[in-house]
Amino acid sequence: MEENKQRVKSMINILQLVAPGTPLREGIDNVLRAQTGGLIVLGYNEQIKSIVDGGFHINCAFSPASLYELAKMDGALILNETGSKILIANAQLVPDSSIDSIETGMRHRTAERVAKQTGSLVVAISQRRNVITLYQGNLRYTLKDIGVILTKANQAIQTLEKYKAVWNDGITNLGILEFEEVVTMSEVVHVLHSVEMVLRIKNEILSYIHELGTEGRLIRLQLTELLADLEAEAALLIKDYHQEKTQDHHQILKKLQDLANTQLLEDSDLVKLLGYPGQTSLEESVTPRGYRITSKISRVPPLIIENLINRFKTLQGVCRATINELDDVEGIGEVRAKKIREGLKRIQEHLYMSRHN
């Protein structure tokens, strides 16, 4: 899984470097439109030096226009790692010919071998096929047309909306069962599955946003709006039901996101994520601590909620507490005690109304 995370991180960094709106992408697009083809290497370390033959050492500031003009020559362009300087123009690259390559064209074969040999980012711009291919180490990625990515991103947003509705239904039903004291592991796992799917689609949309660059601003806004409060509530759900109260619920949610990015999770995986043995029955009754529900009461800060849970242990304990018992909790006076009682009653009524609508 660590290897996959590193791979994803590398791809994000690469896509951000050549995303629409960046000077480098503007220059690459100019070369693509001119149909001259081109080979661009980012980074000039000892390994690159050993395979560069000839060329003009110009060491000038990067500009899209300069890239376009210099790409008219047959050789490769060598840039610094950040793409802010053009170091060498018209360079001949001589990588180790024994390195395997799946490419057929000379330009792309050279690009793949240079990337594998040096680990540097190499951009190959096809002369006839209007395709931009990125290579780094064993990574190979073909940039898609912006229109295609936008279509896929919008489809993913629509799918996310559907799973958000599934989450809303599940979390409403769970809230009602919490007040009725009849929650089983099955209901908790069901809600966590909807969180898993939301996070899986979020990861996919983020990859589109990275590739879209400045063109992905609206998609990012939609994603932010759709996920507003969902992840925070999911973290509190984990805090409510994890076997160990002291576990960092945000870290567990992050672990869920990492797992969602690599595989479809079984019920037993989610049960284990909550600190229980994988063979735990889904019909087993579980009791919420009450962090999620009490956080919905207005003007009750997290420190007071922590004091409440420490005193009454569970949501049921908080609900059954009298005004005097609530008043005894540190930080809660008589006025706030009444607000907590009224707040819990309003939340319960709202949940019942939501279920019948």
From Swiss-Prot:
Residues 8-146 form the DAC domain. Transmembrane segments: none annotated. Its cofactor is Mg(2+). It comes from the Bacteria. ATP binds at residues 75, 93, 106-110. GO terms for molecular function: adenylate cyclase activity; ATP binding; diadenylate cyclase activity; DNA binding. It catalyses: 2 ATP = 3',3'-c-di-AMP + 2 diphosphate. One of its GO terms (biological process) is DNA repair. Signal peptide: none annotated. InterPro entries: DisA, DisA_sf, DNA_integrity_DisA_N_sf, DNA_integrity_scan_DisA_link, DNA_integrity_scan_DisA_N, DNA_integrity_scanning_protein, RuvA_2-like. Participates in a DNA-damage check-point that is active prior to asymmetric division when DNA is damaged. DisA forms globular foci that rapidly scan along the chromosomes during sporulation, searching for lesions. When a lesion is present, DisA pauses at the lesion site. This triggers a cellular response that culminates in a temporary block in sporulation initiation. This is DNA integrity scanning protein DisA. The lineage of its organism: Bacteria, Bacillati, Bacillota, Bacilli, Bacillales.
